[in-house]
Amino acid sequence: MKKFFASILCLGMIFGATGCTSGGDDTYEIAMITDSGSVTDKSFNQSAYEGVKEFGEKNDITYKYYAPKDTDQAGLLSTIDDAVDNGAKVVVTPGFNFSGALYQAQEKYPDVKFVTIDFEPQKDGSGETKVGDNTVSYLFSEQESGYVAGYAAVKEGYTKLGFMGGMALPAV
């Protein structure tokens, strides 16, 4: 997990440097938008926000988190609009709930960099994905950990296995 967030921080440094011009006093804002949780959820959103916060503080870059009022695609896109209107040059979006909103946002804001965590932008739930030139998607390999867990259980002598997932998602 530390390597993952170190990668996010490195990516932020790269994005920050790509927007620099000589002689300018521009300040760059990194926006992190929660999906349905908060930045104190002791999970995905909190980990992402802590990475953004640490990077911002170490590099003297302004940062802010946004919590959408509505978690449907229109509400998430509206929150992305708010972040960009407030000066965000890099927008971090953890969680698959953003897939449709990010599909639109990456085209709407070609000068803004987007970091997606655990999804690729998807057109209206159609399955058609597109990662724009201004977007980087970090994906987890959930199937690998599931395979290893199942293999370990069988090696221990268990032959009747079951699984209960929290949501109907491809990874689950």
Range-by-range predicted roles:
Residues 30-58, 64-77, 95-98, 168-172:
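Extracytoplasmic "Venus flytrap"
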Residues 102, 122-127, 144-152:
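Short, charged beta->alpha transition segments
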Residues 73-88:
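Short, well-structured alpha-helical segments in soluble
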Residues 107-139:
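Flexible loop/hinge segments that line or gate small-molecule binding clefts
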Residues 87-95, 113-117:
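Periplasmic-binding protein-like
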Residues 1-29:
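Short, low-complexity disordered leader/linker segments with a strong preference
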Residues 93-109:
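Hydrophobic alpha-helical
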Residues 52, 145-172:
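An alpha-beta-alpha
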